[in-house]
Amino acid sequence: MLTIALCDDEAEQRSSIGALLQNYAAARPDRTVKLSVFSSSWDLLSTVEEAGGFSIYVLDVVMPGLSGIDLGVRLREMNHRGAIIYLTISSEFAVDSYAARAFHYLMKPVGPDTLFQVLDQAADHLDQERAASITVKTR
């Protein structure tokens, strides 16, 4: 299962990006996709602390309280390995996104072709990581 967390403080952006993500899920019948939507970094962070992480994080950068960059850094400090995709109106923070080991940095507005391609790349990367891991059974 591919779990995707969308976090954006603007309702209109949550709605439009959320619709794109739902279209992505519908266009990928070979993948089970579960989307969770958050209006603040703190809400997402609280959910991750209580219930665990997500496969992919689609994060706005400029948000009140805790920026998307700072949220990404905190997720990494908590050892969450999900792919972080920043989606924002400003290229100003692109270099800062390296601190969170971002998978990609996209500019708003983003079209479905670009977003779907990046999501496919992230999902493929996660599949490769899972396949490369080794389980050792002990007594």
Regions found by a protein language model. Name each.
Residues 6, 37, 86-87:
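Conserved SAM-binding loop
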Residues 2-22, 57:
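Conserved acidic segment of CheY-like receiver
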Residues 15-25, 44-45, 72, 120:
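Short, well-ordered amphipathic alpha-helices
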Residues 35-43:
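Conserved Asp/Asn-Gly motif in the active-site loop of CheY-like receiver
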Residues 25-35, 81-82:
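A generic structural motif
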Residues 135-139:
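C-terminal output/effector regions of signal-responsive regulators
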Residues 46-129:
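CheY-like receiver
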